[in-house]
Amino acid sequence: MIFLTLEHILTHISFSVVSIVIIIHFLTLLVNEFVGLYDSSEKGMLTTFFCLTGLLITRWIYSGHLPISDLYESLIFLSWIFSIIHMVPYFKKHKNYLSTITAPSTFFTQGFATWGLLTDMHQSKILVPALQSQWLIMHVSMMVSGYAALLCGSLLSAALLVITFRKVIRIVGKNNNLLNDSFPVDEIQYMMEKKSIFKNTFFPSSRNYYRFQLIQQLDHWGFRILSIGFLFLTIGILSGAVWANEAWGSYWNWDPKETWAFITWTIFAIYFHTRTNKNLEGLNSAIVASIGFLIIWICYFGVNLLGIGLHSYGSFTLISN
């Protein structure tokens, strides 16, 4: 009873604090002068991390296993990983470009786990025989950690695309006005002028310097986080294959979860291929990573709606009986 009460308290404290952090982020976006509020938001995320850590430890103690065996527990674990990713640039004294992604991710993930799922799903249950293995911690923790890192990296790539295409639209609009006012509608002149404007835009002039730096940082951090996430995902898939062979006598069974995990791995393998190809890097790799964001959610969450396959123990019902 004490553990359940403590878990309840930690859950509400962590969600309340991260909600305040989100409000602070909105305020700092509107008013840049609130530097003190930004520092408070970082301390708030640190508080959220400790509350989620205490929540996971408490649940581990009274359940007897690492709390990653069902959808509710994995969502809390996912929120915890988001909070860790959030604090890495903070402790390294880098400008935290991740904060606008990791803080809302923590908020929405924990919010859905706490308020979006049925109350019965919050209760800790005895592990089914298939999960009573030493491979549980390795496989599930690596997969969820990989999902968290890949989601953050994908959102950074999506942000890069938004900033870049907004700039392209502005340039093209400027170019069209220039053509209408100064030149006849001639295709050759249009292409020459368009090429010239694009070339000048990517120079870090005084007007575009901040945006240029932001794009470079988004690309840099996105690549680093996606690299870590891809490594975790690979380890998770390999450890899962070994576990499957021990439990079911086959390394791979092509059930929905395994199939979408393979699709996810393939998408991000394509991303890293485009990064090594000078003709495809930049926007092309960012587009691939952005597609990967949707694929991850289908793999992690969407497949659970089916409730079929060897991973059906992680599924849930939408309507309570």
Swiss-Prot record:
Transmembrane stretches, start-end: 17-37, 48-68, 71-91, 98-118, 143-163, 225-245, 259-273, 286-306
Q: Which GO terms describe its molecular function?
A: heme binding
Keyword annotations for this protein? Answer: Chloroplast, Cytochrome c-type biogenesis, Membrane, Plastid, Thylakoid, Transmembrane, Transmembrane helix
InterPro entries in the cross-refs: Cyt_c_assembly (IPR002541), Cyt_c_biogenesis_CcsA (IPR017562), Cyt_c_biogenesis_CcsA/CcmC (IPR045062)
Q: Name one GO cellular component term.
A: plasma membrane
Q: How does it sit in the membrane?
A: Multi-pass membrane protein
Entry keyword Plastid = yes
Write down the superkingdom of origin. Eukaryota
Could you state one GO biological process linked to this protein?
Answer: cytochrome complex assembly
Q: Does the keyword Signal apply?
A: no
What's the main place this protein lives? plastid
Task: Provide the protein's localization.
Answer: Plastid, Chloroplast thylakoid membrane
Q: Which family does it belong to?
A: Belongs to the CcmF/CycK/Ccl1/NrfE/CcsA family.
How this chain assembles, per its entry, is: May interact with Ccs1.
Q: Any idea what job this protein has?
A: Required during biogenesis of c-type cytochromes (cytochrome c6 and cytochrome f) at the step of heme attachment.
The identity of this protein, by name, is: Cytochrome c biogenesis protein CcsA
Organism per entry? Populus alba (White poplar)
